[in-house]
Amino acid sequence: MSQYKCLNPISQTGLGLFGEEYKQTEELNDADAILVRSAKMHDMELPENVKVIARAGAGVNNIPVEQCAENGIVVFNTPGANANGVKELVLAGMLLASRDIVGGIEWVAHEEDKEHIDKLAEKQKKQFAGCEISGKKLGIIGLGAIGAMVANSATHLGMEVYGYDPFISIDAAWNLSRTIKHSKSLDEIYSQCDYITIHVPLTDNTRKMIDKEAFTKMKEGVVLLNFARDLLVDEEALIEALDSGKVKKYVTDFANPLVAGRPGILVTPHLGASTAESEENCAVMAVKEVRDFLENGNIKNSVNFPNCDMGTCIAVGRITICHKNIPNMISQFTKILGSEGLNIADMTNKSRGSYAYTIIDLESAASKEALDELKAIEGVSKVRVIK
């Protein structure tokens, strides 16, 4: 029986998919798998028995991904599972930035003369007037699951949509509306668009990508939306752009002391994936990924190892090996297995950056001695037998 530990509350809709072969545990030392949402894991010491971590969400900044790869722990996320929830909040953010809906609601709530509120409203409504988003130009930086959904929905709302993503996947490209215009550079987005929304992961290359130079290239009175990661925007430069009028509104899902309560900035408390549907979708996908990995050794949607799939395990002995992506690894594996008289029925090897993953189906079970020899190979971090 495999055991899993939840570091955060995980939807029972997802956990229910584990079935009787799995047991939830509170002890990290007993866990084969960890499910997590927002818990910080960088200071955690992960025991040898942990084989997989599944993040019920897209971002993995709270997980020591590289350290896990070094120790042969496969880290999954759930790309696209919360995409619709985030998309809807982005669309709401554009509307809130275009029409002073929040200001109007607050005025009604705090107006003391409620008896004559209907007449007062007619007099005061002009101060909350705004503009429509239909006919405006929207620039989308990053056309992954969320960005693509925002793009398609915005076209249905009558917006002229421009997309920039030099790394767009084939699947994402197929799902995009034909009306979306392809921008070849960020400068095209900056110079043409009335609204700009960011949908890229946080990396060393994207950290503070929206900086002072970027703001100088944008249209006067642009609306900027950030529902991806807070550190994508240089907020010191943002404040300058707001004060100068270059940026009309900044809408973000990431509260911090610099932006909270500041005029011209609308901040939500990280609500992007805070819907019942998103939480269920993320939990379901995470549990399915964990089960397929533990039961079959397959990897899909890992952030530190390559996708690798050999289907349902029907072999007498299936071995999975996490190892460094260096020469002469496969030959060492096959030499050890061959010397034990073990015949390989099927095998696949995939690599991603510095790490690789190998699945081997044997016609008979490997001995403990053979497994120990595999584990002893320099560059091998974890060897597992699928039973």
Segments and roles (model prediction):
Residues 250, 263, 271-387:
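NAD(P)-dependent dehydrogenase/reductase Rossmann-like domain
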Residues 136, 143-144:
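Glycine-rich Rossmann-fold phosphate-binding loop(s) that bind the pyrophosphate
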Residues 71, 79-137, 301-303:
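Phosphate-binding beta-alpha-beta segment of Rossmann-like dinucleotide-binding domains, i.e.
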Residues 147-148:
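N-terminal Rossmann-fold NAD(P) dinucleotide-binding loop
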Residues 1-78, 211-213, 223, 234-236, ...:
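An N-terminal-biased, well-structured beta-alpha scaffold segment characteristic
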Residues 42-45, 166-259, 274:
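Rossmann-like adenosine-cofactor binding region
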Residues 87-106, 152-159, 285-298, 334-338:
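Oxidoreductase and adenylate-handling cofactor-binding alpha/beta cores
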